[in-house]
């Protein structure tokens, strides 16, 4: 299965992706992990990305897309993947569609983890990260909503909405059921 995972910060995408990756036998590909790996290994893309990150800027779409393309070309992603953190915009969704098309593949679905803002705030505050305060979290949620609403419209009937409140196991069971697994 070739899936994109969407959901606000704190929705539990990473937690669910780890479980789904194991149960479905496909890799969880996170842009955050790709950035860290490429920077850590000193790859040309990593060096380029690090310059933006060090300057406090967003890594441009073309750099991120090249990292994703390189990762999707690896053999373990041939039969499927869980893509987390890309695409974030309609432009990136089009880039992903082109990458898959070039490989004779299509996206099977877009799992959209839905969770209330208050639950996200509660979850993120409980993580105890220094940069997580309520104001910062609500700002990040606003950015996510503005960025992602057009993406949800763009994917239309590929969207698989999952209610992401409750226990990890419950959310995972809902996801697998919605995927027909």
Swiss-Prot record:
GO molecular function: adenylate kinase activity; ATP binding
Pfam families tied to this protein: ADK
UniProt: AMP binding residues: 31, 36, 57-59, 85-88, 92, 129, 140
Location, primary (coarse class): cytoplasm
Pathway annotation from the record: Purine metabolism; AMP biosynthesis via salvage pathway; AMP from ADP: step 1/1
E.C. designation(s): 2.7.4.3
UniProt region (LID), positions on chain: 126-132
Reactions accelerated catalytically: AMP + ATP = 2 ADP
GO (cellular component) term, any one: cytoplasm
Top-rank taxon, per record: Bacteria
Region of interest (NMP), ranges: 30-59
Domain characteristics, as noted in the entry: Consists of three domains, a large central CORE domain and two small peripheral domains, NMPbind and LID, which undergo movements during catalysis. The LID domain closes over the site of phosphoryl transfer upon ATP binding. Assembling and dissambling the active center during each catalytic cycle provides an effective means to prevent ATP hydrolysis.
Subunit structure: Monomer.
UniProt protein name: Adenylate kinase
UniProt source species: Corynebacterium glutamicum (strain ATCC 13032 / DSM 20300 / JCM 1318 / BCRC 11384 / CCUG 27702 / LMG 3730 / NBRC 12168 / NCIMB 10025 / NRRL B-2784 / 534)
């Amino acid at each position: 299965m070739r899936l994109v995972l969407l959901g606000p910060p704190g929705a539990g995408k990473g937690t669910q992706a780890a479980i789904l990756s194991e149960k479905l036998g496909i890799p969880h590909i996170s842009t955050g992990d790709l950035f860290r790996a490429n920077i850590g290994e000193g790859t040309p893309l990593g060096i380029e990305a690090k310059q933006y990150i060090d300057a406090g800027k967003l890594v441009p779409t073309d750099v991120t897309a090249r990292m994703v393309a390189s990762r999707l070309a690896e053999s373990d992603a041939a039969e499927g993947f869980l893509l987390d953190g890309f695409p974030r915009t309609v432009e990136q969704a089009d880039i992903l569609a082109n990458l898959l098309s070039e490989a004779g593949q299509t996206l099977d679905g877009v799992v959209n983890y839905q969770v209330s803002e208050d639950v996200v705030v509660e979850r993120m505050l409980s993580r105890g990260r220094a940069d997580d305060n309520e104001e910062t979290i609500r700002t990040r949620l606003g950015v996510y909503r503005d960025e992602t609403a057009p993406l949800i419209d763009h994917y239309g009937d590929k969207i698989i909405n999952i209610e992401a409140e409750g226990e990890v196991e419950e959310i995972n069971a809902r996801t697998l059921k919605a995927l027909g697994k």
